[in-house]
A protein has these predicted regions:
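Leucine-rich repeat
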Residues: 3-7, 23-28, 44-50, 66-71, ...
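Leucine-rich solenoid repeat scaffolds
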Residues: 68-137
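Consensus "Asn ladder" position of solenoid repeat domains
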Residues: 15, 36, 54-57, 75-78, ...
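Solvent-exposed loop segments of extracellular immunoglobulin-like
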Residues: 150-167
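Conserved LRR concave beta-strand detector
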Residues: 8-11, 19, 29-32, 40, ...
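C-terminal outer-membrane/trafficking sorting elements
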Residues: 11-13, 32, 229-299
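Surface-exposed, flexible coil segments in extracellular/virion-facing regions
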Residues: 167-186
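Canonical leucine-rich repeat
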Residues: 20-22, 41-43, 62-64, 83-85, ...
Length: 299
């Protein structure tokens, strides 16, 4: 649509459009082009735009920075990973629908100053936060970008993270199956019956709730470092302060091996007494006795 400087309205819904040029439409106030195949669109000439509907396209990002008069704005069912919001922070004032995209807690738009209530922002569900399909125990999983957000709240909110088994939904145990600090996770290498995923919940975006609308990661398979068996001997191992690991009911000539979570061998010990005590630097380890193992956190 070129050389139409007096054009006010465009209705182009449900076509096969892969491109739409509105850079020469400075007076455009109404653009309805939902249900097309647009991968990008330049709206930087459309500062008078009031009504925008680009839902059900293939957009991965959109720049609304000059669209400070927006009322209703519909961008659902795209591939959006980034939205540059109107620069004055007031618009859209009527509705903003961004559900069914690839936005995260950290990239979702906040409730604007012009919205009369949080219900005018529709954001759930979103596509899962993508993680690698396989992660080795000891590898850091960094979700700290999602830890803090304002969203529709009047204050900054903190995200709650819950790791669950894929099929059963059973929650994993913090400081047993994984350690966490400020949204950064390390899996300890405990035996897990299934792949896992992380559910992220926050009062910043309270509609991320329930099976259909929860915000979660993709499924991840946690692998144990090579040379460490899947069996467990946790009932025979205790830890105390000062970096001590104690192995109970050990049999003579059993080989005890202590690994870091990334699979590096820390120390070995051949059992000579019923109880063996091993000194290590406080931290998380995998202890292997014969062909059995368990993870421990040593204070």
């Amino acid at each position: 649509v070129t050389n139409n400087e007096e054009l006010y309205y465009i209705y182009a819904e449900e076509n096969e459009l892969s491109a739409l040029d509105v850079t020469h439409c400075p007076k455009l106030i109404w653009l309805s082009a939902n249900g097309n195949k647009l991968e990008s669109i330049d709206l930087t000439a459309c500062s008078d735009l009031y009504n925008l509907n680009l839902s059900e396209n293939l957009l991965s990002s959109i720049d609304l920075s000059v669209c400070n008069d927006l009322g209703p704005c519909r961008l659902s069912n795209n591939n959006l990973e980034e939205i540059i919001m109107p620069s004055e922070g007031v618009a859209p004032t009527t509705t903003l629908d961004v559900k069914n995209n690839k936005l995260t807690i950290s990239t979702l738009p906040e409730k604007t100053l012009g919205m009369s209530s949080a219900s005018r922002l529709t954001y759930a569900p979103q596509a899962p936060y993508v993680l690698p399909k396989d992660i080795t125990a000891g590898t850091v999983v960094d979700l700290s970008s999602e830890l803090k957000a304002f969203g529709v709240s009047d204050k900054e909110e903190t995200t709650t993270y819950t790791w669950r088994l894929k099929t059963s939904g059973t929650a994993l145990q913090k400081d047993v199956d994984y350690t966490e600090k400020d949204g950064v996770f390390t899996f300890t290498g405990t035996e897990l019956a299934d792949s896992v995923y992380c559910v992220m919940a926050t009062a910043a975006y309270p509609k991320f709730t329930g099976t259909a609308n929860m915000f979660k990661t993709t499924n991840v398979h946690i692998t144990v470092p090579a040379g460490v068996d899947e069996n467990t001997v946790s009932s025979r191992i205790i830890t105390t302060g000062n970096g001590l690991i104690k192995v109970l009911n050990a049999e003579n000539n059993d080989m005890i091996e202590v690994f870091s979570l990334n699979g590096a061998l820390v120390t070995t010990r051949k059992v000579s007494e019923n109880m063996e005590t091993i000194k290590v630097v406080p931290g998380s380890y995998i202890v292997k006795i014969g062909n059995k193992r368990c993870s421990v956190i040593v204070p």
